[in-house]
């Protein structure tokens, strides 16, 4: 039996600055996640911050994506080592860490995903990520195959973007446009010129440090603009948004 689970192709694609088009999975359903995995996206965020996800709902979704070319990325609810450890043990290799504001917080996220001496990840010899102990080189390979993407979505995060982007082990910078807009005094209006200028600034600083940048952009014009500005991994929609739009359109068609 071939139990090779490395290398991490999504991590390699980010490092090579290859454009990666993704989608948000927020319905906490293995069926909808499986459908997304068949659609051809390069990566999928399984949201543990704003969606009703936890370990018990995420494992079936990971199973649903087995064999899919779409790389699963988990957004953890908070930058907390025990939560991150549990996500590692169930089989996630790609992490989106919300609300990172300082270099110290970025470094803590990285350390949470690394075994000692590089980090503080707790050791279990048999779990889903190492195929229940059947991957002989898991400990040797894991540290260098984890992807850490940190989310900048506050004024303090913007102020510290250079230090955050320079943090060793951080693979990418992701802009949270809604929270960023709120932090800048434009709640509900991520299209405000001040917000857009700040997004462009974050992209530029990430690029200056050789780090790829990404964003959630469910409006096509926004997504294309961000790609033109240098974003390399962009989530262009969500299962919830697509489901709501299609069902509303269907209802409107027959209820006019």
Curated annotation (Swiss-Prot):
Mg(2+) binds at residues 153, 179. The record marks 75 as: Transition state stabilizer. GO terms for cellular component: cytoplasm. Catalyzes the reversible retro-aldol cleavage of both 5-keto-4-deoxy-D-glucarate and 2-keto-3-deoxy-D-glucarate to pyruvate and tartronic semialdehyde. Its cofactor is Mg(2+). Keywords: Lyase, Magnesium, Metal-binding. It catalyses: 5-dehydro-4-deoxy-D-glucarate = 2-hydroxy-3-oxopropanoate + pyruvate; 2-dehydro-3-deoxy-D-glucarate = 2-hydroxy-3-oxopropanoate + pyruvate. It comes from Salmonella typhimurium (strain LT2 / SGSC1412 / ATCC 700720). It comes from the Bacteria. Its EC number is 4.1.2.20. The record marks 89 as: Increases basicity of active site His. The active site is at residue 50. Belongs to the HpcH/HpaI aldolase family. KDGluc aldolase subfamily. Homohexamer; trimer of dimers. Pathway: Carbohydrate acid metabolism; galactarate degradation; D-glycerate from galactarate: step 2/3. Binds 1 Mg(2+) ion per subunit. The gene is garL. Substrate binds at residues 151, 178-179. GO terms for biological process: D-glucarate catabolic process; galactarate catabolic process. GO terms for molecular function: 2-dehydro-3-deoxyglucarate aldolase activity; aldehyde-lyase activity; magnesium ion binding. This is 5-keto-4-deoxy-D-glucarate aldolase.
